[in-house]
Curated annotation (Swiss-Prot):
Residue ranges of the propeptide: 11-18
Note: The letter 'K' in the name 'Conopressin-K' proposed by Kumar and colleagues stands for the eighth residue, which differs between conopressins.
Protein name: Conopressin/conophysin, isoform 3
Main location: secreted
Free-text note regarding domains: The cysteine framework of the conopressin is C-C.
Amino acid sequence: ACFIRNCPKGGKRNVDEGPTKPCMFCSFGQCVAPHTCCGEKGCEMGTVDANMCQEENESPIPCHVFGKRCLLNHPGNSHGNCVTYGICCSHDTCTVHLACM
């Protein structure tokens, strides 16, 4: 996964073809979106700590989120990662997901 502004020239589909780095860490886990921090205890969205994740947008190298892949039923964005027990997130949404349990 990559954040919105730091995707490679060809878009998100080209992330696997170029260099990536792990997304930055936040207060209790990993940044999974510009305003979302997830870890073992769940996810925070829009908090002061989670908003620090928007710094990832300044990096020219796309980042990848740890966790196995999961599919979301979300128009235009069906690929996500299991970011904590039972939660699948993409760059713009998180949802409860059985594949992440």
